[in-house]
Amino acid sequence: MICIPIVGPIQKKSLEDIAAAEPLADFLELRLDLMSDYDLEALLAASTKPCIVTNRTKREGGQFSGSEEDRIEILKQAIAAGAEYVDIETSTPKQLLKPFLESERKSKVILSYHNFTDTPEEIGHLYELMCAMPADILKIVT
């Protein structure tokens, strides 16, 4: 499967990139943390492919600079707008992560971990912890 990231940084460029990626991709990843201007509903409507909405934190390689609550609110808006998938980090505070892991949800949840420095020795333990959470997909990047 091929997933092509859409990074903006503005709406017009994102829409152009969606149109260019559509014939090549199985999925599109809308990297909201890299966009300064976007209309999420319009981006989702522009794609015929399933979309993964990501709002990555700086600590895991992204650019979102607002509060953790604001970041999570944007992902909740993505669910309300009809995103097929949302990608949320395991490092998200548990009280903010919990609503994404409840059984009744409109979008599938990708629970992710990113470490671009090294592969931690406790990667097996991390994987076990992630498996215990009711996410649809687990993603570990190291």
Where are these predicted regions, by residue range?
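Glycine/small-residue-rich loop that forms an oxyanion/phosphate-binding "nest" at active or ligand-binding sites
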Residues: 44, 51-99
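Generic alpha-helical secondary structure signal
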Residues: 12-16, 38-41, 69, 73, ...
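Short beta->alpha connector loops
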Residues: 8-12, 33-36, 90-94
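Solvent-exposed, well-ordered amphipathic alpha-helical segments
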Residues: 2-4, 10-28, 73-84, 101
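Hydrophobic faces of well-ordered beta-strands that scaffold small-molecule active sites
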Residues: 2-8, 26-30, 51-54, 84-88, ...
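Acidic (Asp/Glu)-rich catalytic clusters
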Residues: 18-23, 37-51, 77-81, 97-106, ...
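Active-site mouth loops of central-metabolism enzymes
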Residues: 1-14, 57-69, 112-121
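Catalytic alpha/beta core domains of metabolic enzymes, predominantly
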Residues: 85, 91-142
